[in-house]
Regions:
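Active-site beta-loop-alpha substructure in enzyme catalytic cores
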Residues: 63-70
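Binuclear metal-ion centers of metallo-dependent hydrolases, dominated by the metallo-beta-lactamase
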Residues: 60-61, 82, 88-135
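Conserved phosphate-coordination/catalytic loops
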Residues: 27-30, 75, 108
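Core dinuclear metal-dependent hydrolase active-site scaffold
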Residues: 1-62, 131-135
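Structural motif
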Residues: 44-46, 66, 92
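Loop/helix-junction capping segments adjacent to catalytic residues or to phosphate/diphosphate-binding pockets
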Residues: 75-78, 104
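Alpha-helical scaffolding within the catalytic cores
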Residues: 54, 77-83
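Active-site metal-binding loops of divalent metal-dependent hydrolases
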Residues: 50-52, 71-73, 98-99
């Protein structure tokens, strides 16, 4: 995945943007950890995850109403999301970053099979450009 990204045509196309991404990656770190925010609004429990990496030593909130998940950056996304669902047990998942949001280090992710991977009792919300999501 890393080699494919480094040698993709997007590296040339977005080389100026890549410099900014690399600089901000080092500048905007939060203790060199993956960030996961948990909040509650009017009894609606929400997790905002900046990554699909979960630490086995951490106890995460469970049975949340919404998991906002960055779905990007791995070659085993389907396998990884199944593990996240087992750990967090969300009622609904809102995908982010499944599009080419940070070229050249991101790419468009094929999400067409995702509904087959996620249990049917879990809502899957795929945001659309300029369309409001009502929770």
């Amino acid at each position: 995945l890393i080699v494919n990204t480094l040698f993709s045509k997007d590296v040339i196309k977005y080389h100026d943007y890549l410099k900014i991404l690399i600089k901000n990656n080092f500048k905007c770190r939060e203790k060199n950890e993956t960030v996961l925010y948990f909040t509650s609004v009017n009894k609606v429990r929400i997790i905002l995850s900046g990554s699909m990496a979960l630490d086995k030593k951490i106890t995460y909130p469970k049975n949340v109403d919404y998991l906002i998940l960055a779905y990007q950056g791995r070659s085993d996304l389907d396998k990884k999301i199944v593990n996240i669902i087992k750990v967090i047990k969300p009622k609904n998942i809102i995908l982010t970053h499944f599009d080419n949001s940070f070229p050249p280090i991101s790419k468009n992710v094929n999400i067409s099979n995702l509904r087959n991977v996620i249990p049917s009792n879990i809502g899957l919300i795929i945001p659309e450009y300029e369309k409001e999501i009502v929770l």
